[in-house]
Protein backbone atom coordinates (compact mmCIF):
# COMPACT_ATOMS: atom_id res chain seq x y z
CA UNK A 1 0.00 0.00 0.00
CA UNK A 2 1.38 3.40 -0.94
CA UNK A 3 0.62 6.90 0.24
CA UNK A 4 1.16 9.93 -1.96
CA UNK A 5 2.39 13.00 -0.06
CA UNK A 6 2.42 16.58 -1.23
CA UNK A 7 5.85 18.19 -1.52
CA UNK A 8 5.07 20.36 1.48
CA UNK A 9 4.01 17.42 3.63
CA UNK A 10 7.05 15.41 2.57
CA UNK A 11 9.44 18.28 3.28
CA UNK A 12 7.91 18.86 6.70
CA UNK A 13 8.36 15.18 7.56
CA UNK A 14 11.64 14.23 5.90
CA UNK A 15 13.14 17.49 4.69
CA UNK A 16 13.27 18.81 1.11
CA UNK A 17 13.91 16.44 -1.79
CA UNK A 18 15.02 16.66 -5.42
CA UNK A 19 13.64 19.78 -7.08
CA UNK A 20 12.72 21.53 -3.83
CA UNK A 21 14.28 24.90 -3.20
CA UNK A 22 15.55 26.37 0.06
CA UNK A 23 16.20 30.03 0.84
CA UNK A 24 19.46 30.72 2.67
CA UNK A 25 18.58 32.83 5.72
CA UNK A 26 16.92 36.10 4.66
CA UNK A 27 19.02 36.48 1.52
CA UNK A 28 17.91 36.37 -2.11
CA UNK A 29 19.88 33.14 -2.56
CA UNK A 30 17.95 29.97 -3.36
CA UNK A 31 19.50 26.51 -3.52
CA UNK A 32 17.78 23.56 -5.20
CA UNK A 33 18.27 19.92 -4.24
CA UNK A 34 20.05 18.23 -7.15
CA UNK A 35 19.77 14.63 -5.99
CA UNK A 36 18.20 12.65 -3.16
CA UNK A 37 20.16 9.60 -2.00
CA UNK A 38 17.28 8.34 0.11
CA UNK A 39 14.56 5.97 -1.15
CA UNK A 40 10.96 7.18 -1.11
CA UNK A 41 8.96 5.11 1.31
CA UNK A 42 12.10 3.75 2.98
CA UNK A 43 13.33 6.93 4.69
CA UNK A 44 14.73 6.51 8.19
CA UNK A 45 13.75 8.81 11.01
CA UNK A 46 14.20 8.52 14.76
CA UNK A 47 11.49 8.99 17.37
CA UNK A 48 8.47 7.41 18.99
CA UNK A 49 6.55 5.43 16.39
CA UNK A 50 9.23 6.18 13.80
CA UNK A 51 11.46 3.98 11.64
CA UNK A 52 14.79 3.59 13.48
CA UNK A 53 13.71 0.83 15.86
CA UNK A 54 14.99 -2.68 16.44
CA UNK A 55 13.98 -4.96 13.61
CA UNK A 56 12.75 -2.04 11.53
CA UNK A 57 15.23 0.63 10.42
CA UNK A 58 17.83 -0.67 12.89
CA UNK A 59 19.66 -3.89 12.07
CA UNK A 60 21.32 -6.53 14.25
CA UNK A 61 24.82 -5.76 13.01
CA UNK A 62 27.65 -5.27 15.47
CA UNK A 63 29.59 -2.07 16.06
CA UNK A 64 32.34 -2.94 13.59
CA UNK A 65 29.79 -3.02 10.76
CA UNK A 66 27.78 0.12 11.50
CA UNK A 67 28.60 3.82 11.89
CA UNK A 68 28.98 5.47 15.26
CA UNK A 69 26.63 8.27 14.19
CA UNK A 70 24.17 8.86 11.36
CA UNK A 71 22.81 12.27 10.42
CA UNK A 72 19.50 11.49 8.75
CA UNK A 73 17.87 13.21 5.76
CA UNK A 74 20.21 16.20 5.68
CA UNK A 75 20.71 18.68 2.86
CA UNK A 76 24.44 18.78 2.08
CA UNK A 77 25.79 22.03 0.66
CA UNK A 78 29.36 21.59 -0.54
CA UNK A 79 31.53 22.53 -3.49
CA UNK A 80 30.72 19.24 -5.23
CA UNK A 81 26.95 19.41 -4.99
CA UNK A 82 23.71 20.20 -3.19
CA UNK A 83 22.11 16.89 -2.26
CA UNK A 84 19.83 15.21 0.25
CA UNK A 85 21.40 12.24 2.02
CA UNK A 86 22.15 10.38 5.21
CA UNK A 87 25.69 10.95 6.51
CA UNK A 88 27.58 8.18 8.32
CA UNK A 89 30.39 8.94 10.78
CA UNK A 90 32.83 6.29 12.01
CA UNK A 91 35.90 6.75 14.23
CA UNK A 92 35.70 10.52 13.88
CA UNK A 93 35.59 10.49 10.08
CA UNK A 94 32.92 10.72 7.42
CA UNK A 95 32.35 7.09 6.48
CA UNK A 96 29.67 7.38 3.82
CA UNK A 97 27.08 9.58 2.16
CA UNK A 98 24.05 7.61 1.08
CA UNK A 99 20.95 5.79 2.30
CA UNK A 100 20.84 4.62 5.91
CA UNK A 101 18.65 1.87 7.32
CA UNK A 102 18.40 -1.87 7.80
CA UNK A 103 19.78 -3.74 4.77
CA UNK A 104 18.15 -6.97 5.96
CA UNK A 105 14.66 -5.67 5.18
CA UNK A 106 15.08 -2.42 3.24
CA UNK A 107 16.21 -1.98 -0.38
CA UNK A 108 19.01 0.32 -1.47
CA UNK A 109 20.64 0.68 1.95
CA UNK A 110 24.30 1.72 1.81
CA UNK A 111 24.66 2.63 5.50
CA UNK A 112 23.58 0.00 8.03
CA UNK A 113 22.24 1.28 11.34
CA UNK A 114 22.82 -0.84 14.44
CA UNK A 115 22.56 -0.73 18.21
CA UNK A 116 25.95 1.02 18.27
CA UNK A 117 24.68 3.90 16.12
CA UNK A 118 23.70 7.31 17.49
CA UNK A 119 21.28 9.40 15.42
CA UNK A 120 21.23 13.13 14.77
CA UNK A 121 18.03 14.28 13.07
CA UNK A 122 19.01 16.23 9.98
CA UNK A 123 15.50 16.61 8.57
CA UNK A 124 15.09 20.17 7.35
CA UNK A 125 18.69 21.08 8.18
CA UNK A 126 21.59 22.11 5.95
CA UNK A 127 24.99 20.54 6.62
CA UNK A 128 28.24 22.18 5.54
CA UNK A 129 31.88 21.36 6.11
CA UNK A 130 33.46 23.22 9.00
CA UNK A 131 34.88 26.55 7.91
CA UNK A 132 38.62 27.18 7.55
CA UNK A 133 39.96 30.62 8.45
CA UNK A 134 43.50 31.07 7.10
CA UNK A 135 44.17 34.61 8.33
CA UNK A 136 44.23 34.45 12.12
CA UNK A 137 46.10 36.83 14.38
CA UNK A 138 46.25 34.76 17.55
CA UNK A 139 45.81 37.82 19.75
CA UNK A 140 43.40 36.30 22.26
CA UNK A 141 42.42 32.66 22.77
CA UNK A 142 38.80 33.73 23.19
CA UNK A 143 38.72 34.18 19.41
CA UNK A 144 38.42 30.41 19.21
CA UNK A 145 35.09 30.46 21.06
CA UNK A 146 33.72 33.05 18.64
CA UNK A 147 35.02 31.26 15.56
CA UNK A 148 33.68 27.86 16.58
CA UNK A 149 30.25 29.31 17.34
CA UNK A 150 30.16 30.78 13.83
CA UNK A 151 30.86 27.44 12.14
CA UNK A 152 34.64 27.68 11.74
CA UNK A 153 36.44 24.51 12.82
CA UNK A 154 40.00 25.17 11.59
CA UNK A 155 42.10 28.27 12.30
CA UNK A 156 45.46 28.91 10.61
CA UNK A 157 47.68 31.91 11.24
CA UNK A 158 50.22 33.13 13.72
CA UNK A 159 50.83 35.06 16.89
CA UNK A 160 51.66 34.78 20.56
CA UNK A 161 48.89 36.78 22.23
CA UNK A 162 48.39 40.57 22.38
CA UNK A 163 52.03 41.38 21.62
CA UNK A 164 52.53 44.39 19.36
CA UNK A 165 53.92 42.19 16.61
CA UNK A 166 50.95 39.82 16.74
CA UNK A 167 48.47 42.70 16.73
CA UNK A 168 49.78 43.61 13.28
CA UNK A 169 51.18 40.40 11.77
CA UNK A 170 50.14 36.74 11.68
CA UNK A 171 53.50 35.32 12.73
CA UNK A 172 54.53 32.98 15.52
CA UNK A 173 58.24 33.82 15.51
CA UNK A 174 60.93 31.34 16.42
CA UNK A 175 61.08 27.81 17.84
CA UNK A 176 60.35 28.78 21.46
CA UNK A 177 57.10 30.56 20.64
CA UNK A 178 56.15 27.82 18.20
CA UNK A 179 56.52 25.15 20.87
CA UNK A 180 54.49 27.14 23.40
CA UNK A 181 51.66 27.81 20.91
CA UNK A 182 51.51 24.16 19.86
CA UNK A 183 51.25 23.21 23.53
CA UNK A 184 48.48 25.78 24.00
CA UNK A 185 46.62 24.29 21.02
CA UNK A 186 45.96 21.18 23.10
CA UNK A 187 43.48 23.16 25.20
CA UNK A 188 41.04 24.17 22.47
CA UNK A 189 38.39 22.14 20.59
CA UNK A 190 39.40 23.37 17.16
CA UNK A 191 41.98 22.44 14.54
CA UNK A 192 44.98 24.77 14.64
CA UNK A 193 48.10 25.45 12.61
CA UNK A 194 50.72 28.17 13.01
CA UNK A 195 52.76 30.24 10.56
CA UNK A 196 56.32 31.26 11.39
CA UNK A 197 57.87 34.62 10.56
CA UNK A 198 59.12 34.52 6.98
CA UNK A 199 60.98 37.82 6.85
CA UNK A 200 64.64 36.88 6.61
CA UNK A 201 67.16 36.90 3.78
CA UNK A 202 69.01 33.73 4.79
CA UNK A 203 67.43 30.27 5.06
CA UNK A 204 68.37 29.03 8.53
CA UNK A 205 66.14 31.36 10.63
CA UNK A 206 63.20 30.11 8.57
CA UNK A 207 64.13 26.43 8.43
CA UNK A 208 64.34 26.24 12.22
CA UNK A 209 60.76 27.51 12.51
CA UNK A 210 59.50 24.87 10.08
CA UNK A 211 61.41 22.23 12.04
CA UNK A 212 59.76 23.50 15.22
CA UNK A 213 56.28 22.85 13.81
CA UNK A 214 55.24 25.76 11.59
CA UNK A 215 52.87 24.78 8.77
CA UNK A 216 54.32 27.57 6.68
CA UNK A 217 55.75 31.07 6.78
CA UNK A 218 54.24 34.54 6.74
CA UNK A 219 55.85 37.48 4.98
CA UNK A 220 54.49 40.79 6.30
CA UNK A 221 55.35 44.29 5.20
CA UNK A 222 55.64 45.43 8.82
CA UNK A 223 58.66 43.10 9.12
CA UNK A 224 60.05 44.11 5.71
CA UNK A 225 58.70 42.18 2.72
CA UNK A 226 61.55 42.87 0.33
CA UNK A 227 62.25 40.92 -2.88
CA UNK A 228 65.21 39.26 -1.14
CA UNK A 229 63.04 38.12 1.77
CA UNK A 230 60.35 36.86 -0.62
CA UNK A 231 62.82 34.87 -2.69
CA UNK A 232 64.49 33.31 0.35
CA UNK A 233 61.18 32.45 2.02
CA UNK A 234 59.80 30.73 -1.07
CA UNK A 235 63.02 28.76 -1.47
CA UNK A 236 62.67 27.42 2.07
CA UNK A 237 59.01 26.61 1.44
CA UNK A 238 59.92 24.67 -1.70
CA UNK A 239 62.47 22.66 0.27
CA UNK A 240 60.05 21.84 3.10
CA UNK A 241 56.70 21.50 1.25
CA UNK A 242 55.07 24.29 3.23
CA UNK A 243 53.02 27.30 2.18
CA UNK A 244 53.96 30.97 2.22
CA UNK A 245 51.43 33.69 2.97
CA UNK A 246 52.30 37.26 2.10
CA UNK A 247 51.12 40.74 3.02
CA UNK A 248 52.88 42.87 0.43
CA UNK A 249 54.50 46.30 0.52
CA UNK A 250 51.78 48.98 0.75
CA UNK A 251 54.27 51.82 0.52
CA UNK A 252 56.00 50.33 -2.53
CA UNK A 253 59.32 51.01 -0.77
CA UNK A 254 61.21 47.95 -2.01
CA UNK A 255 59.47 47.86 -5.38
CA UNK A 256 56.06 47.86 -6.97
CA UNK A 257 53.67 44.96 -7.45
CA UNK A 258 55.64 43.91 -10.53
CA UNK A 259 58.78 43.60 -8.39
CA UNK A 260 56.98 41.35 -5.94
CA UNK A 261 55.56 39.14 -8.69
CA UNK A 262 59.05 38.88 -10.20
CA UNK A 263 60.42 37.76 -6.82
CA UNK A 264 57.85 34.95 -6.75
CA UNK A 265 59.60 33.43 -9.79
CA UNK A 266 56.48 31.46 -10.62
CA UNK A 267 56.40 29.74 -7.22
CA UNK A 268 53.14 29.11 -5.37
CA UNK A 269 52.16 31.69 -2.77
CA UNK A 270 49.02 32.62 -0.82
CA UNK A 271 48.52 36.37 -1.18
CA UNK A 272 46.68 37.76 1.82
CA UNK A 273 44.84 41.05 1.37
CA UNK A 274 44.35 40.73 -2.36
CA UNK A 275 41.66 43.31 -1.89
CA UNK A 276 40.50 46.88 -1.89
CA UNK A 277 41.66 48.19 1.47
CA UNK A 278 43.42 45.62 3.62
CA UNK A 279 46.99 46.29 2.64
CA UNK A 280 49.62 45.39 0.12
CA UNK A 281 50.85 47.29 -2.90
CA UNK A 282 48.75 50.44 -3.26
CA UNK A 283 46.69 50.79 -5.32
CA UNK A 284 47.10 47.76 -7.58
CA UNK A 285 47.65 44.63 -5.48
CA UNK A 286 44.54 43.22 -7.21
CA UNK A 287 46.71 42.62 -10.29
CA UNK A 288 48.10 39.43 -8.78
CA UNK A 289 44.72 37.70 -9.31
CA UNK A 290 45.86 37.03 -12.85
CA UNK A 291 48.93 34.98 -11.90
CA UNK A 292 48.73 31.17 -12.09
CA UNK A 293 51.02 30.70 -9.08
CA UNK A 294 49.12 33.16 -6.87
CA UNK A 295 46.36 31.86 -4.58
CA UNK A 296 44.50 35.05 -3.62
CA UNK A 297 42.34 35.71 -0.58
CA UNK A 298 40.70 38.76 0.89
CA UNK A 299 39.50 39.49 4.40
CA UNK A 300 36.09 40.23 5.83
CA UNK A 301 36.23 43.90 6.96
CA UNK A 302 35.54 45.03 3.38
CA UNK A 303 32.98 42.27 2.75
CA UNK A 304 30.69 43.34 1.24
CA UNK A 305 31.06 46.97 0.18
CA UNK A 306 28.51 49.07 2.11
CA UNK A 307 27.88 52.73 2.89
CA UNK A 308 29.74 52.28 6.20
CA UNK A 309 32.82 50.43 4.95
CA UNK A 310 35.07 53.43 4.36
CA UNK A 311 34.17 55.24 7.57
CA UNK A 312 35.19 52.45 9.91
CA UNK A 313 38.43 51.53 8.17
CA UNK A 314 40.67 54.49 8.95
CA UNK A 315 40.53 54.17 12.73
CA UNK A 316 40.83 50.38 12.52
CA UNK A 317 43.95 50.67 10.42
CA UNK A 318 45.64 53.18 12.72
CA UNK A 319 45.20 50.87 15.70
CA UNK A 320 46.12 47.60 14.00
CA UNK A 321 49.37 48.80 12.48
CA UNK A 322 50.62 50.86 15.42
CA UNK A 323 50.25 54.16 13.57
CA UNK A 324 50.01 57.66 15.04
CA UNK A 325 47.30 59.93 13.57
CA UNK A 326 49.34 62.98 14.58
CA UNK A 327 52.13 61.94 12.19
CA UNK A 328 51.39 62.98 8.62
CA UNK A 329 53.27 60.07 7.10
CA UNK A 330 51.33 57.54 9.20
CA UNK A 331 48.04 59.12 8.17
CA UNK A 332 49.04 59.08 4.50
CA UNK A 333 49.99 55.41 4.82
CA UNK A 334 46.55 54.60 6.20
CA UNK A 335 44.65 56.64 3.64
CA UNK A 336 46.54 55.05 0.74
CA UNK A 337 45.09 51.67 1.72
CA UNK A 338 41.41 52.65 1.77
CA UNK A 339 39.99 53.08 -1.73
CA UNK A 340 36.28 52.85 -2.52
CA UNK A 341 36.92 51.88 -6.15
CA UNK A 342 39.04 48.85 -5.33
CA UNK A 343 36.71 47.78 -2.51
CA UNK A 344 33.80 47.81 -4.97
CA UNK A 345 35.84 45.80 -7.47
CA UNK A 346 36.62 43.28 -4.75
CA UNK A 347 32.92 42.38 -4.53
CA UNK A 348 32.79 41.60 -8.25
CA UNK A 349 36.10 39.73 -8.30
CA UNK A 350 34.74 37.44 -5.61
CA UNK A 351 31.54 36.90 -7.56
CA UNK A 352 33.39 36.01 -10.75
CA UNK A 353 35.79 33.65 -8.99
CA UNK A 354 38.98 35.68 -9.33
CA UNK A 355 39.40 35.88 -5.55
CA UNK A 356 39.58 32.30 -4.35
CA UNK A 357 39.31 32.54 -0.56
CA UNK A 358 37.83 34.66 2.21
CA UNK A 359 39.19 34.90 5.75
CA UNK A 360 38.90 37.09 8.84
CA UNK A 361 42.11 38.95 9.79
CA UNK A 362 40.94 38.42 13.35
CA UNK A 363 41.16 41.41 15.73
CA UNK A 364 43.53 43.04 13.24
CA UNK A 365 40.83 44.75 11.18
CA UNK A 366 38.67 41.66 10.69
CA UNK A 367 36.01 39.95 12.79
CA UNK A 368 36.75 36.32 13.58
CA UNK A 369 33.12 35.29 14.00
CA UNK A 370 31.92 36.80 10.73
CA UNK A 371 33.79 34.99 7.95
CA UNK A 372 30.76 32.91 7.01
CA UNK A 373 28.23 35.73 7.44
CA UNK A 374 30.27 38.13 5.31
CA UNK A 375 30.80 35.52 2.61
CA UNK A 376 27.07 34.98 2.13
CA UNK A 377 26.28 38.69 2.46
CA UNK A 378 28.66 39.28 -0.45
CA UNK A 379 26.95 36.54 -2.46
CA UNK A 380 23.55 38.11 -1.75
CA UNK A 381 24.70 41.61 -2.69
CA UNK A 382 26.10 40.37 -5.97
CA UNK A 383 22.90 38.43 -6.76
CA UNK A 384 20.84 41.56 -6.17
CA UNK A 385 23.16 43.90 -8.08
CA UNK A 386 24.40 41.64 -10.88
CA UNK A 387 21.69 39.02 -11.26
CA UNK A 388 22.16 35.31 -11.83
CA UNK A 389 25.54 33.95 -12.84
CA UNK A 390 25.75 32.44 -16.33
CA UNK A 391 26.17 28.99 -14.79
CA UNK A 392 22.91 29.31 -12.81
CA UNK A 393 19.29 29.09 -13.87
CA UNK A 394 16.26 31.21 -13.12
CA UNK A 395 15.24 28.62 -10.51
CA UNK A 396 18.30 28.53 -8.30
CA UNK A 397 21.68 29.94 -7.32
CA UNK A 398 23.39 26.58 -6.95
CA UNK A 399 26.61 27.46 -8.74
CA UNK A 400 26.96 30.74 -6.88
CA UNK A 401 26.40 28.89 -3.60
CA UNK A 402 29.07 26.32 -4.47
CA UNK A 403 31.48 29.08 -5.48
CA UNK A 404 31.05 30.96 -2.22
CA UNK A 405 31.09 27.95 0.12
CA UNK A 406 34.36 26.86 -1.52
CA UNK A 407 35.97 30.16 -0.49
CA UNK A 408 36.03 29.20 3.19
CA UNK A 409 36.16 25.40 2.98
CA UNK A 410 37.93 23.44 0.24
CA UNK A 411 40.08 26.19 -1.29
CA UNK A 412 41.80 27.20 1.98
CA UNK A 413 42.34 23.49 2.65
CA UNK A 414 43.96 22.95 -0.74
CA UNK A 415 46.09 26.07 -0.36
CA UNK A 416 47.57 25.05 2.98
CA UNK A 417 47.97 21.34 2.37
CA UNK A 418 45.22 20.06 4.66
CA UNK A 419 42.57 19.03 2.10
CA UNK A 420 43.34 15.37 2.76
CA UNK A 421 41.80 15.86 6.21
CA UNK A 422 39.31 18.74 6.13
CA UNK A 423 37.55 21.19 3.84
CA UNK A 424 34.68 19.18 2.38
CA UNK A 425 32.02 16.59 3.15
CA UNK A 426 33.54 13.50 1.58
CA UNK A 427 34.15 9.95 2.83
CA UNK A 428 37.46 9.58 4.63
CA UNK A 429 37.67 13.15 5.86
CA UNK A 430 37.61 14.31 9.45
CA UNK A 431 33.98 14.76 10.51
CA UNK A 432 33.99 18.50 11.17
CA UNK A 433 30.39 19.29 10.28
CA UNK A 434 28.11 22.26 10.86
CA UNK A 435 24.33 21.91 11.02
CA UNK A 436 22.10 24.89 10.21
CA UNK A 437 18.41 25.64 10.20
CA UNK A 438 17.84 27.29 6.80
CA UNK A 439 16.40 30.44 8.41
CA UNK A 440 19.64 30.86 10.37
CA UNK A 441 22.02 29.61 7.68
CA UNK A 442 25.43 31.24 7.82
CA UNK A 443 24.56 33.10 10.99
CA UNK A 444 23.86 30.83 13.95
CA UNK A 445 24.56 27.10 13.62
CA UNK A 446 22.34 24.64 15.44
CA UNK A 447 25.22 22.28 16.18
CA UNK A 448 28.92 21.90 15.44
CA UNK A 449 30.57 18.48 15.28
CA UNK A 450 34.32 18.11 15.75
CA UNK A 451 35.82 14.82 14.73
CA UNK A 452 32.39 13.22 14.76
CA UNK A 453 31.44 14.38 18.26
CA UNK A 454 29.22 17.30 19.24
CA UNK A 455 31.45 20.15 20.39
CA UNK A 456 29.06 23.09 20.54
CA UNK A 457 25.29 23.39 20.33
CA UNK A 458 22.43 25.71 21.07
CA UNK A 459 21.21 24.46 24.42
CA UNK A 460 18.58 25.60 26.87
CA UNK A 461 18.57 25.72 30.65
CA UNK A 462 20.54 22.68 31.92
CA UNK A 463 18.21 22.46 34.94
CA UNK A 464 15.09 22.32 32.79
CA UNK A 465 13.02 19.20 32.24
CA UNK A 466 13.67 19.29 28.47
CA UNK A 467 16.58 20.71 26.40
CA UNK A 468 14.77 23.72 24.92
CA UNK A 469 13.67 26.17 27.69
CA UNK A 470 15.33 29.57 27.63
CA UNK A 471 17.89 30.91 28.00
CA UNK A 472 19.03 29.10 24.85
CA UNK A 473 22.61 29.88 23.86
CA UNK A 474 25.78 28.15 22.74
CA UNK A 475 27.15 25.77 25.31
CA UNK A 476 30.21 23.56 25.06
CA UNK A 477 29.45 19.88 24.76
CA UNK A 478 31.33 16.70 25.62
CA UNK A 479 33.82 16.91 22.75
CA UNK A 480 35.37 19.87 24.59
CA UNK A 481 35.99 18.00 27.83
CA UNK A 482 38.69 15.71 29.17
CA UNK A 483 40.54 13.41 26.85
CA UNK A 484 37.84 13.71 24.17
CA UNK A 485 39.10 17.17 23.24
CA UNK A 486 42.47 15.90 22.05
CA UNK A 487 40.86 13.07 20.10
CA UNK A 488 38.35 15.17 18.18
CA UNK A 489 40.57 18.03 17.01
CA UNK A 490 43.80 18.16 15.03
CA UNK A 491 47.01 20.16 15.12
CA UNK A 492 48.64 20.75 11.75
CA UNK A 493 52.44 20.86 11.49
CA UNK A 494 55.13 20.49 8.85
CA UNK A 495 56.29 17.06 7.72
CA UNK A 496 59.78 18.02 8.92
CA UNK A 497 58.48 18.65 12.43
CA UNK A 498 56.42 15.47 12.51
CA UNK A 499 59.42 13.42 11.42
CA UNK A 500 61.50 15.07 14.13
CA UNK A 501 59.10 13.81 16.81
CA UNK A 502 57.83 17.12 18.15
CA UNK A 503 54.64 15.50 19.45
CA UNK A 504 56.62 13.50 21.99
CA UNK A 505 59.22 16.19 22.63
CA UNK A 506 56.62 18.88 23.31
CA UNK A 507 54.28 16.51 25.15
CA UNK A 508 51.37 17.17 22.79
CA UNK A 509 48.08 15.39 23.39
CA UNK A 510 46.34 16.18 20.12
CA UNK A 511 47.01 14.17 16.99
CA UNK A 512 49.44 16.04 14.76
CA UNK A 513 48.86 15.98 11.02
CA UNK A 514 51.57 17.03 8.54
CA UNK A 515 50.58 19.40 5.75
CA UNK A 516 51.36 18.17 2.24
CA UNK A 517 51.26 19.13 -1.44
CA UNK A 518 51.55 22.83 -0.64
CA UNK A 519 53.98 23.60 -3.45
CA UNK A 520 52.21 22.12 -6.45
CA UNK A 521 48.82 23.78 -6.02
CA UNK A 522 47.97 26.56 -8.51
CA UNK A 523 45.15 28.97 -9.21
CA UNK A 524 43.70 26.34 -11.55
CA UNK A 525 43.12 24.12 -8.50
CA UNK A 526 40.94 26.71 -6.76
CA UNK A 527 37.53 25.09 -7.10
CA UNK A 528 34.92 27.37 -8.72
CA UNK A 529 37.32 30.27 -8.09
CA UNK A 530 40.04 29.94 -10.72
CA UNK A 531 39.44 32.95 -13.00
CA UNK A 532 42.69 34.75 -13.91
CA UNK A 533 41.78 38.11 -15.44
CA UNK A 534 44.24 40.69 -16.68
CA UNK A 535 43.74 43.53 -14.20
CA UNK A 536 44.85 47.15 -14.25
CA UNK A 537 44.21 49.85 -11.66
CA UNK A 538 44.31 53.52 -12.64
CA UNK A 539 46.83 55.20 -10.29
CA UNK A 540 44.81 58.45 -10.24
CA UNK A 541 41.18 57.33 -10.18
CA UNK A 542 41.71 53.80 -8.78
CA UNK A 543 39.31 52.43 -11.41
CA UNK A 544 39.73 48.66 -11.77
CA UNK A 545 39.68 47.15 -15.27
CA UNK A 546 39.55 43.34 -15.66
CA UNK A 547 39.84 41.87 -19.15
CA UNK A 548 38.79 45.23 -20.55
CA UNK A 549 35.73 45.67 -18.32
CA UNK A 550 35.33 48.32 -15.61
CA UNK A 551 34.50 46.64 -12.31
CA UNK A 552 32.31 48.84 -10.17
CA UNK A 553 29.20 48.55 -8.04
CA UNK A 554 27.22 50.62 -5.57
CA UNK A 555 27.62 50.20 -1.81
CA UNK A 556 24.83 48.33 -0.07
CA UNK A 557 22.57 50.38 2.18
CA UNK A 558 21.04 47.37 3.91
CA UNK A 559 22.18 43.76 4.26
CA UNK A 560 20.56 40.45 5.15
CA UNK A 561 21.95 38.26 7.94
CA UNK A 562 22.33 41.35 10.09
CA UNK A 563 20.37 43.14 12.81
CA UNK A 564 17.20 41.05 12.71
CA UNK A 565 19.32 38.10 13.88
CA UNK A 566 21.16 39.93 16.64
CA UNK A 567 18.52 41.76 18.66
CA UNK A 568 19.56 39.93 21.81
UniProtKB/Swiss-Prot annotation:
PTMs per UniProt: Carboxylation allows a single lysine to coordinate two nickel ions.
Source organism superkingdom: Bacteria
Keywords: Cytoplasm, Hydrolase, Metal-binding, Nickel
EC number, UniProt record: 3.5.1.5
Enzyme active site: 321 (proton donor)
GO molecular-function terms, A-Z: nickel cation binding; urease activity
Cofactor note: Binds 2 nickel ions per subunit.
Keyword Hydrolase: yes
Domain spans labelled Urease: 130-568
Binding positions (Ni(2+) 1): 135, 137, 218, 361
Record's keyword annotation contains Protease: no
Pathway: Nitrogen metabolism; urea degradation; CO(2) and NH(3) from urea (urease route): step 1/1
GO biological process, one term: urea catabolic process
Catalyzed reactions per annotation: urea + 2 H2O + H(+) = hydrogencarbonate + 2 NH4(+)
Any one GO CC term of the record: cytoplasm
Complex formation: Heterotrimer of UreA (gamma), UreB (beta) and UreC (alpha) subunits. Three heterotrimers associate to form the active enzyme.
Family: Belongs to the metallo-dependent hydrolases superfamily. Urease alpha subunit family.
Name of the protein: Urease subunit alpha
Protein's gene: ureC
Amino acid sequence: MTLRLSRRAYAEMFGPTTGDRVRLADTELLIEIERDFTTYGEEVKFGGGKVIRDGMGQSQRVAADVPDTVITNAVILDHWGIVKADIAIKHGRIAAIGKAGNPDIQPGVTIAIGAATEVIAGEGLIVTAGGIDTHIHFISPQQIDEALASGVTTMLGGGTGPATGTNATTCTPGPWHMERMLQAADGWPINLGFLGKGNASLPQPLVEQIAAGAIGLKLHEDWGTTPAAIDNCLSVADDTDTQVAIHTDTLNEAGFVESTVAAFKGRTIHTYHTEGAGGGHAPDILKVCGEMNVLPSSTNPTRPYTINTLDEHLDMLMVCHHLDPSIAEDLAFAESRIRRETIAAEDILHDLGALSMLSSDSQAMGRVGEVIIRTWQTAHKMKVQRGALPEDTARNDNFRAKRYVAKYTINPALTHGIAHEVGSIEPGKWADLVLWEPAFFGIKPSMILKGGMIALAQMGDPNASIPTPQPVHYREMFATRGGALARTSLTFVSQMAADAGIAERYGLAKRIVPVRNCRNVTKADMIHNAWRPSISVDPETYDVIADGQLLTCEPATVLPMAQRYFLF
